[in-house]
Every structure is written in C-alpha cells, then in structure tokens.
Amino acid sequence: MFHASADMLPSFVTVPLLVPTCPPPGFPRLLVNALTSVVGYVAVELRGAHSPDPLPSFTFDLSTRIKGNYIARAASWRQGGHFTQSLAGLAGKSVRVAARIPGAKVFSLTLECTAGKEVKSS
C-alpha cells in the first residue's frame, strides 16, 4: 500500500469541463479509462470550475477507488448509505476533475449521458 501523505501522491487536475444535460431518464456520469498496478488505484473528486476546493458530495474521501484495467469505469461517490454515479445535480455546470493516481495510469476521462435510470448500490 501507499503510505504517503495525500499531497505526495501522484495526481492531476483537469481544465474546467462542462457536465452534460441529459434527457430523462438518463443522467450524466464520469467514465474513467485507467490501468492500475496490483496496489494502485484511481480516486476522483470534482471541484468548482474556478475553485481549488472539492464539491461537498464529490470528495476524494467519498470516492470509490478504481482498481484494475477499465476502458470505461464509472466513477462513484458514497452518499448516505449507497454509492452514486449520477452528476445530475451538476448538469449544465463546469467542473474540474481531480484524480489521485498512485500506481495507476489514466488514459481518458469522459463525461457522458446514460440511457436509463441509475441503480444505486450499497
């Protein structure tokens, strides 16, 4: 495992990206194309377009760590007793994506609309 302070972990922050507005019943979500080592991971948080601070429901602490090899893995965050992929509350707004990537490579990030309703997992 990585035992470094969060400030020391490999990371990046994107330029502002527009979260799409999706026709019902779809919702916007963030897809990650990444490859991690056995102990590596990708953790994602969302920030305001012009702020270094994370958006309250989309912090690194609430992010599900992505581990493995994925072409299009949906990022998710813990909200209450379940995990959500939906960015519906951010539709039409610009956000910056911050990622911590110890032992990982991120090849692309995609903001997309889904075709159906979200099924929340616990």
Regions from the PLM with identified roles:
Residues M1-S122:
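Beta-rich accessory regions
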